[in-house]
Amino acid sequence: MTELTFFPTDWRSEDVEPDKGEPYFRINIFGKTMDGKTVCVRAKFTPFFLLETPESWSAARTNLFITETAMKYDAIRPSCLPTKRKNMWGYDGGKMRPMVQFVFKTLSQMRKAKYRLKNEYQIYESSVDPIIRIFHLRNINPADWMHVSKAFPVETRISNSDIEVETSFQHLGPSDLKEVPPLIIASWDIETYSKDRKFPLAENPADYCIQIATTFQKYGEPEPYRRVVVCYKQTASVEGVEIISCAEEADVMNTWMTILQDEITDVSIGYNLWQYDLRYIHGRSMMCVDDITGEDNVRLKNLGRLLVGGGEVIERDLSSNAFGQNKFFLLDMPGVMQIDLLQWFRKNRNLESYSLNNVSKLYLGDQKNDLPAMQIFEKFEGGADDRAIIAAYARKDTDLPLKLLKKMAILEDITEMANAVKVPVDYINFRGQQVRAFSCLVGKARQMNYAIPDDKMWTVDGKYEGATVLDAKKGAYFTSIAALDFASLYPSIIRAHNMSPETLVMDKRFENLPGIEYYEIETGLGTFKYPQKNDETGEGQGVVPALLDDLAKFRKQAKKHMAEAKKNDDEFREALYDAQQRSYKIVMNSVYGFLGASRGFIPCVPIAASVTATGRKMIEHTAKRVTELLPGSEVIYGDTDSVMIRMKLPDDKIHDMDEQFKMAKWLAGEITKDFKAPNDLEFEKIYYPYILYSKKRYAAIKFEDPDEKGKVDVKGLALVRRDFSPITREILKESLDTILFKKDTPTAVTETVECIRKVLDNEYPMEKFTMSKTLKTGYKNECQPHLHVSNKIFERTGFPVPSGARVPFVYIEDKKNLDTKQSFRAEDPTFAQENDLIVDRLFYIEHQLMKPICSLFEPLLDDPETEIFGHPLIKGKIDELKSTFKADLRDAKRTKKNIANNQREITSFFKKK
């Protein structure tokens, strides 16, 4: 027997059926010790659920039921015990209910029993993942140091780890160790070849995987310690890089896997691994088969820490409104944490392009070496020096992800989110918000002696209103506007009014209990009541409010630690605590959505309706109190959690920014007194000037300090929307800067007219007109510009655009397709420039510039379209374009009709001189 402290990198679970003995359930935990030894801990666990029994049953009747049920469904009888828990569904005064905890040897046995018993009895918590269960039972963080108090040697090993032990889940616990874990990060990238000069396809015999580059860096260290490129065919040396040349393609992949094992890799990262590199390696491994024996020459099973089972194919589907349906293709690496930085950026950043080159340029000021695919193919066919150029290119593609990982604190972001919600890291990559919130709820419910019932759902009859938006008083305000915001409004409402599934009154017997104060709120779904907690003792607090209290406390602590780390110039810990506090904030804000979902683990739509109804009342009350506390003031707009106020101040204080800040803070403090804690109305900024277009659409200069210069703040306008071209955003930005900073509308009009004139005269480069959209799968409407362009790219190059990629396109003048839909006139910008194609100026004027520009100037001009687009400098040019378009369209239709009728045009009889 021994003790063990290690940092976990991967959690796995499985039912085990040994050759001898009973089947059992096991959790395999992989990780690394402080001295760099790899670990595999095999922890036995007995899955369980709770079952509610009738209150009328005697102890003898209950015991008989336990015995009979345990025998019938293969439960572990000595471990199946009666207990009492509170039901987390519907207020009943916190009554303890009789339950039985049924414990099973395997997860499959537990599930079979649950499905057979659920129609007769109320089952609780059968859907809790056993790994998540252990996190809460043993107070373990999924990605933090942990301790095994009793570990035993194994008879038969399942891993190649330095240390492999068996234990019971009861011997697992957290560790006090706070050191940076000695994790080895491997950033890797493959280079591929196509003999036919098309997009390389793994199933084509001659489309080899020609190089695999890997850069290794120890977590927390400033620089990599090893760079290696494994190459197919002899390759010359590259400075600072270890070159390994192989005679066979299979040797390239096998050597690479051996290097990963030798370096004891804990974290595997790259860019677009899950949609390209891993799929390609798997495809090529299937091609590398011994001609005589038929055996695989590539040993994918060597991936990861298990002796058997590495390299298995894992396909994941991820569906979202933003990206459509995406398929991810992984090769299993047991014990190794896998991160695809491309997917992290798609999920967390809103960018024009997600290419490694663009992302690196944006966040690092660095970029890839320029080596197009065709040159890679040519250099592979050349000599050793040519292939060395490919190796240098590949090495750079492994350095950039490591720099991005550190710069953006991506590993910290993922692991701290996993720790905050107590789910495996893998869930952060591939699961949504529901399972995160549910895990938090499971832990808090257990602490408070509640059980979460299975299959509970509120039948929605009617529709509740969303967040309040007070009528926007549109206009250009060249006076100061104070913005008052509620801090974390929805979580604060839930905490203040004790809203939780088990505090919601669903039974009239409990709606007027003596000595209990209730909060009552009317919604579109009906009127709901919630018993309030005792403010002095905390008695009666609901599970969800208690959970949110904890998360708020944890976030406050993390922000404090972050400030201390910043003070001590500890960048690593500052990033760590920043990731922590952001994780807690995200979880707090996701609880409302979790409860308001129509389907899920414990959907409770009345709570969501109650929260939004309460928020509406608070916004309306705030607007009323502003005019009472500061007569003559006006609320010009109210959104979900904020109000915009034109404060009435003495004439000599109107332009005094210090006085504006002082009065706004006083207003916020006075109104906060009207609301139940922890609701807090804060003052954070003054807008001056402020142009209000409609709800959720404004432009202003924001001041967060009376002595600062101020920053432009825009919401809802074309200026900040990706579906408009850069030229649109550029013109709008220039116009808006003049309006806001110079407060000079006439000059802004003049500058805008000149910009439009330059568009009409083709004075802007093509990239200013280039837009992009994410390519999805399964379009119902195939008349999409980016879809047409992606098809054109494939037809011309043989290189398919992968699903999930952003496809750039530009609309060009195309007389042949004037009578077709506009999307057919979309073109690949690179092709358009190489072939001297002209931008469709009329399209950009009418569909990209006219409406956004007129909308921008609407509060400032009587007739923006006439004053700008009717200006003598540009009106004639626009009219000429329209006239030419009509004539060309008429000719195109006539030509198409003649072709359809097999008729020659009269001009075909004339000879050109």
Swiss-Prot record:
Residues 182-401 are annotated as: Contains conserved residues essential for 3' -> 5' exonuclease activities. Its EC number is 2.7.7.7. One of its GO terms (biological process) is viral DNA genome replication. The keyword tRNA processing does not apply. It catalyses: DNA(n) + a 2'-deoxyribonucleoside 5'-triphosphate = DNA(n+1) + diphosphate. SUPFAM superfamilies: DNA/RNA polymerases, Ribonuclease H-like. Keywords: DNA replication, DNA-binding, DNA-directed DNA polymerase, Early protein, Exonuclease, Hydrolase, Multifunctional enzyme, Nuclease, Nucleotidyltransferase, Transferase, Viral DNA replication. PROSITE patterns: DNA_POLYMERASE_B (PS00116). One of its GO terms (molecular function) is 3'-5'-DNA exonuclease activity. Coiled coil: none annotated. InterPro entries: DNA-dir_DNA_pol_B (IPR006172), DNA-dir_DNA_pol_B_CS (IPR017964), DNA-dir_DNA_pol_B_exonuc (IPR006133), DNA-dir_DNA_pol_B_multi_dom (IPR006134), DNA/RNA_pol_sf (IPR043502), DNA_pol_B_thumb (IPR042087), DNA_pol_palm_dom_sf (IPR023211), DNA_pol_type-B (IPR050240). SMART domains: POLBc. In addition to polymerase activity, this DNA polymerase potentially exhibits 3' to 5' exonuclease activity. Belongs to the DNA polymerase type-B family. NCBIfam families: pol2. This is DNA polymerase. It comes from Paramecium bursaria Chlorella virus NY2A (PBCV-NY2A). The gene is DPO.
